[in-house]
Amino acid sequence: MTQAYYRKTPQQALEAQNASAEGLSAQEARRRAEQYGPNKLSEGKKKSTLQVFLEQFKDLMVLILIIAAVISAFSGNVESTIVIFAVLVLNAILGTVQYEKAEKSLESLKAMASPTAKVMRGGVRVEIPSADVVPGDIVLLEAGDMVVADGRVLENFSLKVNESSLTGESEGVDKTAEAIDADQVALGDLKNMVFSGSLVTYGRATVLVTGTGMDTELGKIAALMNQTQQRKTPLQQSLDSFSAKLAMVIMAICAVVFALSIFRTGMGILDSLMFAVALAVAAIPEALSSIVTIVLAMGTQKMARQNAIMKDLKAVESPGSVSVICSDKTGTLTQNKMTPQKVYADGSLLEGEDLSLVNDVQRLLLKAALLASDATNNEKEGTAIGDPTEVALVMLGEKFGVDEESYRAQHPRLGELAFDSDRKLMSTLHDIDGVPTLFTKGAIDVLLNRSTHLLTREGKVEMTPERREELARVNMELSMEGLRVLAFAYKELDAVRPLTLEDENGFTFIGLISMIDPPRPEAVQAVADAKRGGIRTIMITGDHKVTASAIARQLGIFRDGDEAVSGVELDGMTDTELDERLPHISVYARVSPEHKIRIVNAWQRRGNIVSMTGDGVNDAPALKKADIGVAMGITGTEVSKDAASMILADDNFATIVKAVVNGRSVYANIKNAIQFLLSGNTAGIFCVLYASLLALPVPFQPVHLLFINLLTDSLPAIAIGMEPARKGLLDQKPRDPREPILNRPLLARIGGQGLLIAIVTMIAFYLGYQGGDAVMASTMAFATLTLARLFHGFNCRGSESIFRLKLSTNKYSVLAFLAGVVLLLLVLFTPGLKSLFMVAPAFGFANLGEIVLLAFLPTLVIQLVKLVCDARRGK
């Protein structure tokens, strides 16, 4: 609807809606309410809590465990079944709770709607619920009102609207009633339209409603939110791939063992099946799902302490693999407040702080800036109130101890010509030393054409073409730096009288004041750190291309050879053309929510893990579409927070870099935990296969494997997950998301380490089997495998030797080892537990000494190999 109305005149717009300035009749309003429905945002289809809970069991590893648990139950091994199901249900509950907290986007969008609206109905002004507004209604807007529907401005009285929640830009937008004759106009340039969810900050207007509910720009965003599908996180993708491959390997091994048990050892089918199930339980890292959840939860807590709040546990490691950050400008990379910068007066271009109140021209420039504005300073709260541009002028006065209130008290306003987007001027009349003086601020091109003189320290001089050219040159120079420039002039009147537009001529030009929404100081370093870590930062903004490029250059985002593209230019590109130019585009200006999703999609097509940061409603769909959406916690709308995976509590772009380091650390710790669990399980598989091939007694009882996998292993694995971040993580490039979590080097380490542990375990088995005592052999193998895996926890802390890492850097690894040893000793020497865990009655401390020596051998070998590797790397 918007595109059809901005080109029409007010009268044509009324005719198109079959409406009049008197408003709709009550009967017609009811008819249209039935036709168009309530002025509300529709809700997306939601999953029930039960659906969410059941979806937690779709993971392949979980399904395999369920099958193993069911077979165990039918085979009489009830204890294993109960423990496995308890672990799976706990994981499902945790996943459901996280999901329920994250899905609230549409509720926040609905809450943004104003509860009431002032409309004309049958020539009478009435106030109605915003849900009852229909297309064709005449809405009356004034300062402080929330716009409740999209509409065409019919009458404009200096209306200024803050559309930052839609466009992302904090500067108020001046509205007009004039038609716009253009084929394609960006949302931020539709000066004769107002949009649902925006706020009126100044003036008033009469508006014809052209769109309600889902037919508004806000509704389009809600629709995008419903349609946008979130991709799985890199960790989810890696674990899915890992689970599928591990399942195939386990099923193949179990099939081989099942066959060997029948044909090699002569075991019955049921016994062989139970043995194969026991092997499956030994092979599957039952604790992995719980440990990954715990490691992610601990990562979440650490990030929260660093002001990065993660909503989805599975996304905690995602920042570590991000290769592209698509960042909103206003409030994210910049401070979201206009700040005075350079001043031009008396032929000199100065920094704002270099302004001299001794200089008559500069003093008059400051006086004009404070008098010809309406912003005020709130001393109690330490903030200024008003239009952001005028707030910057108040800030300039503060730098020199000049209070705008005292200025205005000394020189009260005697008359005013309010700002108008057509004139691009604002004028106020004051008494200056007994002389009625008109101060005017506005666009330099307008004021230059209306100025006949220029003020210098010598007095007024004629405004010659050369002087106009010089002022225009300075303005262009400031604009190219991304600065917004305001011009100031004055005119002395003969007497105090009502002002007319004719008075805005014959000015004496005073000077220029420029301002900017400055970059956050920490954002500059954060962008540089991101680049060092192999991460590309892209600026996406609703601002003008020149301004955005200048800010991006200051931040280090935009470099020589880079491109800046507007939303209109982006519309003219095919996906193929965009893909070709994508690596060179660093700035996207005047973009819509659809553009943002298209940009994210383009980078994802190239195999990148994409992060999108933002704080406005307009960012929400792209935040949800991105691999990881980052919302601002202070300035961000509830919509953006609910759509994002991560919220920055301090709105600090630099916090993202900390999240990257933490994400990489979390992924490394999960990978190390997987190495620990699988190498230990591999050792158990090697032992069982060896025993099957040689027709030896079963080396482990099912209760042994359950003890190792669910109790002893979990403690060191959790400790590995608490390993502090290594130095130099930010110097590494983002990992390839296509790389499996189990790559060849890791598989080789798992296989080699598992073989070492299996060898010492089977040596212990033979030591116990010397007298043909199968129970003693099983006890020796069980105790050795358990202790060897406890020692192995130190090997899996990282790639460096523990002699370089130092045990003190992770006290939890020591505590986990000691706790595991205590549990093992209790099982081996406590009478009641000995019988429960089928420990040989003859097992004593002499046997324990043999076990300790054997169990430590794999760790000794692995640490010696690491020392050699460290020496070769020059560490």
Language model features with spans:
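Generic alpha-helical transmembrane segments
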Residues: 712, 757, 779-793
